[in-house]
UniProtKB/Swiss-Prot annotation:
UniProt GO MF annotations: ATP binding; dTMP kinase activity
Gene3D superfamilies: P-loop containing nucleotide triphosphate hydrolases
Species of provenance: Blochmanniella floridana
GO cellular component: cytosol
Reaction it catalyzes: dTMP + ATP = dTDP + ADP
Protein name, entry field: Thymidylate kinase
The encoding gene: tmk
């Protein structure tokens, strides 16, 4: 069922949302119109509420790293069970902006949370229901910070340090070399070149998928 589940991953400011829309356009050009998009954290009413709690600083209370992780997995569970699985069960394609991998990179490598806890949460919530294909948009952390600083409002995570984003990026890159379903792309290139690479890859990938 997850053959139709594709995700775009990467640091904040790497261009994930743009690429998700470009992939949807690619599918439409291939006459595949039963496509939905998702964004983590969010995508359902409850997941959106959790997303707001995660992203916005409280005036009177500090959100702990553990609470952040638990809320992310709660939001992910809501999205997976209420949106992603039902869509895939119907035969739709799902193009996601982030997935379980983000927590391993951001909360695991970035926040330095316990890997045993992360694996346990992933097993219970995801239960090996992973995307068939992940495009990881690789971009230097310095470029990320220069891009996101131009945004009007930065959320809690976007305000993190260069060393934090370096740890997150290192984890993404390491995993991309180890996992066959993670395709690493140099996202510091012009958008047109990134899209050409993705379209060519999808051409071959879809051909192999439907052999």
């Amino acid at each position: 069922m997850n053959n139709r589940f594709i995700v775009v991953e990467g640091l904040d400011g790497s261009g994930k949302t743009t690429i998700v829309h470009k992939i949807v356009k690619y599918f439409y050009n291939q006459k595949i119109t039963n496509v939905i998009t998702t964004h983590e954290p969010g995508g359902t009413e409850i997941a959106y509420i959790l997303s707001e709690l995660i992203k916005n600083k409280s005036k009177n209370e500090k959100l702990t790293d553990l609470s952040e992780l638990l809320m992310l997995y709660a939001a992910r569970s809501q999205l997976l069970e209420n949106v992603i699985k039902p869509a895939l069960f119907k035969g739709d394609w799902v193009i996601g902006d982030r997935c379980d991998l983000s927590s391993f990179a951001y909360q695991g490598a970035g926040r330095k949370l316990n890997s045993v806890l992360l694996n346990m949460l992933s097993q219970y919530v995801i239960n090996d229901f992973f995307p068939k294909l992940i495009f990881y948009l690789d971009i230097p952390s310095e470029l990320v910070l220069s891009r996101i600083k131009n945004r009007k409002v930065l959320d809690r995570i976007e305000q993190e340090s260069l060393s934090f984003f370096n740890r997150v990026r290192s984890y993404y890159r390491k995993l991309a070399f180890l996992k066959e379903n993670i395709i690493m792309i140099d996202a510091s290139q012009p958008l047109e070149q990134v899209c050409v690479f993705i379209y060519r890859y999808l051409d071959q990938w879809l051909c192999d998928l439907y052999k």
